Regions:
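Glyoxalase I/VOC metalloenzyme domain signal
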Residues: 1-3, 9-29, 37-82, 101-229
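Short, small/polar residue-rich loop motifs at catalytic or cofactor-binding pockets
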Residues: 92-95
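Surface-exposed loop and turn segments in beta-propeller and other repeat-based domains
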Residues: 85-88
Length: 229
């Protein structure tokens, strides 16, 4: 399940643009929105007020973890538990991650998925980010959303879904379904933002996961792709 585009709100498009520009990402402004390119994916942010924080993860090439870690810590603040800034994923994920402080309170993540092919790079740069790997989506009923996605052929990934957390998709792209107000790991204070989110992906038909929370096919028209709410 490749995430082609994610449409979500931010309190400040200028803050988002400045942050990702500092990382070296390609930024495009279009009226009241800003679009950030992450490899094969795009993130489009539109200004609106809301409470809480978003979570996004970006896939890095397998074999580049140490170089990516060094590159990242020179550009932003890493999030930690104690003095630990590197985290192994669940055994079923075969991954490891670095979390970092994003703009507008975002909890961002670089993730190396060992099931993907190894790719060597001389020195890590923003161009080596492969895609948006995960996007957090607050839903009123996690298990009901899992059922909706399963019926469309998008299955749970890794650990068994619970009433407040489920990863759904595959190694190429995941929706992280969570209940509003839950803390984003590895913090205990940044709470899940309950906002409209639209994810453009390889689904064949549009799906609603809650008020303003939707999955849209890449073939949808611009009007159909627009965030709800």
């Amino acid at each position: 399940m490749q995430i082609k585009e994610a449409l979500l709100p931010t309190r400040s498009t200028s803050t988002v643009a400045a942050f990702f520009d500092r990382l070296g990402c390609v930024i495009t402004r279009d009226g009241s929105s800003v679009t950030v390119r992450i490899g094969l994916s795009r993130m489009r942010f539109v200004e609106r007020d809301f409470d809480g924080s978003h979570h996004l993860a970006f896939t890095i090439p397998t074999g580049t973890f140490d170089k990516a870690h060094q590159w990242l810590e020179q550009r932003t603040t890493l999030l930690s538990v104690g003095d630990r800034t590197e985290f192994e994923g669940p055994g079923s994920w075969n991954s490891r991650s670095i979390y970092f402080d994003g703009p507008d309170g975002q909890v961002l993540e670089l993730i190396e998925r060992r099931a993907l092919p190894i790719r060597h790079v001389e020195s890590f740069a923003a161009d080596d980010l492969e895609c948006v790997s995960e996007i957090g989506v607050a839903v009123p009923d996690v298990l009901a959303a899992v059922t909706t996605l399963r019926a469309a052929g998008i299955r749970p990934y890794g650990n068994k879904p619970t009433s407040d957390f489920a990863a759904v998709g595959d190694v190429d792209g995941l929706l992280i379904l969570v209940t509003p107000g839950r803390a984003w790991f590895p913090t205990d204070s940044r709470r899940v933002a309950d906002t409209p989110v639209t994810v453009i992906t390889s689904v064949e038909r549009g799906l609603m996961l809650g008020a303003g929370k939707s999955l849209r096919p890449a073939t949808a028209s611009p009007a159909e792709r627009a965030p709800n709410g």
